[in-house]
């Protein structure tokens, strides 16, 4: 029902190495003495990933004969709203290392064809410059066939061509993007 693609870096690897020790763990392990050194790769980059949701299958489990689409449509809607909130404020915590993974560019909508239109289609043509012409090409294809409405949210300051993104793609804030998607989800389930 919900699929996340792998996150792919949009930039070449340019990283660093973090070295640390774990004295607390070493002190709790009787046969290990020392600081138990470790290292971790540090890579800062813009990443792209795709999330696809088949709204017709939310709450449906044929193996257990569950169909919330018929029994509790509100639960289906609430699940997708919570998913959107999770993506909007995404972060990760691993070994006391917290990373902000909130989207800085988001594009999508509800389409009448189940296809991840933007998967592997975002690229940076130069340093922090989003390839707007490639996105426009995809949008023209979607719009020419009346497949649905596409929304775009962007933190313009994070891209060197923020003004081009705003004027060419008619982007809005990330908050407005997610608000419009939530509204689309509400409308979708209200009509079913």
Report each predicted region and the residues it spans.
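Basic polyanion-binding and macromolecular-assembly surfaces
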Residues: 1-192
């Amino acid at each position: 029902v919900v699929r996340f693609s792998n996150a792919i870096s949009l930039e070449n690897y340019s990283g660093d190495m973090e070295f640390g020790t774990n004295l607390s763990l070493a002190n709790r392990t009787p046969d290990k003495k020392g600081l138990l050194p470790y290292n971790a790769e540090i890579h800062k980059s813009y990443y792209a990933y795709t999330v696809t949701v088949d709204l017709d299958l939310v709450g449906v489990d044929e193996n257990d004969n569950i169909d919330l689409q018929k029994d509790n449509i509100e639960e289906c809607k609430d699940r997708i709203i919570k998913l959107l909130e999770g993506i909007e404020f995404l972060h990760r915590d691993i070994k006391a290392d917290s990373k902000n993974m909130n989207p800085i560019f988001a594009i999508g909508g509800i389409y009448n064809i189940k296809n991840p239109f933007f998967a592997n289609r975002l690229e940076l043509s130069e340093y922090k410059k989003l390839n707007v012409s490639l996105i426009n090409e995809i949008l023209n294809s979607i719009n020419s066939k009346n497949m649905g409405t596409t929304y775009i949210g962007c933190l313009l300051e994070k891209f060197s061509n923020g003004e081009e993104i705003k004027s060419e793609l008619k982007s809005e804030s990330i908050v407005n993007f997610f608000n419009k998607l939530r509204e689309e989800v509400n409308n979708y389930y209200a009509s079913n």
